[in-house]
Amino acid sequence: MAHKKGQGSVKNGRDSRSKRLGVKKFGGQEVIAGNIIIRQRGTKWHPGKGVGMGRDYTIFSLVDGRVFFDREGRRVNVAPEGSEAAN
């Protein structure tokens, strides 16, 4: 019986879409309440003053102001526009 053997399937050749993680607003940039500052997996950065954290570890602004990063404690803060910390 002259049958053609079926082609085997390929097990590789897939990839997931990128998740677009990272810093969205950098130090010194102005933000309004609700703006996403960082998208991350886990707590690479921690929320500081004027900042909240979502259940997927997204860091977002709670107040209008200016973003600044504290590298020592790896914290992200938002200083309200009229405060001294913003300068």
UniProtKB/Swiss-Prot annotation:
Region Disordered, residue ranges: 1-22
The record ties this protein, via SUPFAM superfamilies, to: Ribosomal L27 protein-like
Q: Which UniProt keywords apply?
A: Ribonucleoprotein, Ribosomal protein
Q: List the disulfide bonds.
A: none
Pfam families named among the record's database cross-references? Ribosomal_L27
- Write out the transmembrane intervals: none
Recorded hits in InterPro entries, A to Z, give: Ribosomal_bL27 (IPR001684), Ribosomal_bL27_CS (IPR018261)
Q: Name one GO cellular component term.
A: cytosolic large ribosomal subunit
GO function terms (MF aspect): structural constituent of ribosome
The superkingdom listed in its UniProt entry is Bacteria
GO biological process per UniProt: translation
**NCBIfam families (alphabetical):** L27 (TIGR00062)
What family does this chain come from, according to its entry? Belongs to the bacterial ribosomal protein bL27 family.
Q: What is this protein called?
A: Large ribosomal subunit protein bL27
Provide the species name.
Akkermansia muciniphila (strain ATCC BAA-835 / DSM 22959 / JCM 33894 / BCRC 81048 / CCUG 64013 / CIP 107961 / Muc)
Q: Which gene encodes it?
A: rpmA
